[in-house]
Amino acid sequence: MSVELLSILVLFGVFFLLMFLSVPVSVSIGLATIATVLLSLPFDNAMFVTAQKMITALDSFALLALPFFILAGNIMNRGGIAMRLINLALVLAGRLPGALAHCNVIANMLFGSISGSAVAAAAAVGGTMGEMQRKAGYDPGYAAAVNIASCPTGLLIPPSNTFIVYSTISGGTSVAALFLAGYLPGILMGLGIMVVAGIIAYRKKLPVNERVPLNVAVGAFLQAILPLSLIVIVIGGIVKGTFTATEGSAIAVVYALFLAVVVYREIKLKDLPKIFLDSMVTNAIVMLLIGCSSGMSWAMANADIPGIIEDAILALSQNKVIILLTINLILLIVGFFMDMTPAILIFTPIFLPIAQSLGVDPVHFGVMMTFNLCMGIVTPPVGSCLFVGCSVGKVRLAQVIPYMLPMYIAMIITLLLVTFIPQISLYLPQLLMGYGG
């Protein structure tokens, strides 16, 4: 058996064995990396090199944006913006059949993009919208399914921490281009879910909302304009080159603090230490994942694992369509069992070179990969948003899955559109910043 093949077996064998034993993901990655490096280096050298690669990976200016965006998201999450966005979404949903379901989708798109967390969107928006839909006579399983399926849209609509992680692991893909590239796919995901929700609502003859008076509509817009301005200020500044993504993330924290503490007064000064601590813990978890995954990426490159996997996939077919479908299928399966961040960190170094050899732009591939893995957080057996959505909706999984199935189909169709129509991702970066790959 060749050293390269043995490295593949050891790396993924140890990793999945430890995952099966419920060892934390970052620890599983680190131990699998060390086990693989030991095949070619003595113990002392293996430990030193692995630690060195982990620390070097974190020595990145771009990664400074992550803790600030995480903190800004936590502040906005607790700053009373959910209800303001829901009121605006009620106006935007209009008098469509199942308008409250459409409102849920729109609110998740808005809230998720501001908070940067699909789980936070599922909890904050779903907790309020679920009760409103229940009182309006909606099936609780249907209401929960709409909330669950739409909460990942905020991971595509910037600012997105996921894109920052992808930018780092992919060798410096433009964060600004990734942010712009996520808009249309995120909106398409939301629209696909709204179409399915609308068809179900029409068949079930769900009630239509009363017409919203003009003064109420204007009031809802004015209430939501300040939180939404965060997106305009941060993304606009990054795209125009006024400031970097890291500087933009710091501005987001200052703006979020101003809204939550001074304008809305939903957060007291005594609440800030707890918010800072929670943000530090979340950031530490993410940074540990990035460090360990970067060590694994180096170990894979050292053993030429990406090259071996590339040769194996290309041996199956030279057809670009078949290869992209194969990559999507593998990522869908990975998403069933692994969270988005470690999946991006582990599989980007494997699949991105293959995609680039086929002429796929790294920004387009990053959006495709993120969209694909978004489905993993709303599917069993480990989908975090699926179980949070069931919890806040006070429903069992069996009540939700029948409604989720057509939404999964809509998401897969949209994924295929994003995969095979690159301009869905690349149009805005090319239009607004002259991106050329």
Residue ranges of predicted features:
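Alpha-helical transmembrane segments of multi-pass membrane transport proteins
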Residues: M1-G437
